Amino acid sequence: MQQASNTPKSSLIELNAPDASPYPFNIVVREELGDNIKMFSFTVTGIDFQTKQVKTCEYQLDERNHKGYLNFFEKLALDFGLRLPQNRQMVQTNPEFKATYREVLSENLDPQILYGYGDPAVIQVKSDSTTEEPIFYLLSTSNDAPHAFPIIRSRNLQDWEFVGFVFPENHKPAWAANDVLVSDYWAPEMHQIKDKFYVYFVGRDKETRELCIGVAKSFNPEGPFLADEEPIISGNVIDPHVFVEDNGTAYLFWKEDNNDVWPGKLINFLYENPAYILDLFEEEENKITASFMVTLWPWVQNLEPMERFLFNQVFIESIIAKYLLFFDRLTEIRKDKPTPIQEAIQEVQQFMKTPMYIQELSEDGSSLVGERTKIIENDLAWEAHLVEGMWVTQHQNKFYLFYAGNDFSTDQYGIGVAIADSLLGPYRKMPQPFLQSTAEWWAPGHPSVVLAPDGKPHLFLHGYFPGKAGYKQFRALLSVPIIFEEDRVLLGEI
């Protein structure tokens, strides 16, 4: 990487493909500061995949959001033959999957809610009075919005009103990052444990930029909430879920966010060993994509985590389209290789699994006690590179684990089910996704289960409008009735 010039408002960075890269690129990145945010433009020189002649193209990243990156990579696909982003491909929903999602909320209830109702967690809070109906509360993801974690309430699960935020502006946890394009406030869940309300949530450590799980507490489900001074778990962990037993003992579920780790490990390995691109990728478009990302990597690796994901996404998609086969190919390639190569590939494979764990919470809800137990990990083809967004509910003598799999920002995302005889498992997965994208709603994800006023169980989830999936895009609140059977879950009738 060569820095050609550097001024307070503008810098040029020149990047060349490493030797032995099968599709050599030269990329010049221009960073310009405008309106307190950097804007990027690129001069890309490479081989035209149709004429096989060298050409140079100019690109301006028109927006530093998911749409802007999709536009950028769509143009690269047309000019240089990179893989077309999944969200720009012709979508074919599974014709065998039939479901009707009930639209609960399809717009923000308050202007301060910026991104809708991603990762919706619903609970019922019973009144101390025998004459008053219980109230349902729902919390959702807020990403980098000024106010974190909207709280809404309802008495019937149909009509909702805005209450406020777990963390209003300037009241976020001291340990967590709080900047646009940097902070990530995800997946809050509120649970009542005895006489107190606990909100478990994801935030990004302001020093390490790692995702962590924190907790905030209040005696009122509508707040105010006070966060603990330190997170409960650190080190790229997300999606806390709490299960409270009848005796008040609480357990915390969480997921290791290794899907944020392995892409960088793999790209770095290919940067140092570019000849393996030809061994690992079959389709030419994927070889070109890998070569492009390897060239860009010395610059991309220094970006903030979610922006790094937006750059890496098409590379990730080239792998998760046949994820289990790619994993097996890595295993085959590392055989009989020098020890450093074997160790580097094994490290990539280690992070290609995203295990979920459960562990008992302390009585004050601020720490873990005992030993953790692994619940599930991604091992089905449809799940691809991750499982996440879990919720466990008990019905009779069975425990039902609902979870999401695949890429949250594409039509490939879906919801799975695993069933156990004990809270700690072992859990047996239903082989096919329980919920998938439809023509009306994309990427159903991060479910929660609640009993409706009529006593019947309903699954609440989020979904994108078709063609509008992506990071920090609006997610609607949807629901479906469900029926529990001993070895499976079925959709009920709306």
Report residues per predicted region.
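Carbohydrate-active catalytic/glycan-binding domains of CAZyme proteins
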Residues: 2, 6, 10-14, 18-37, ...
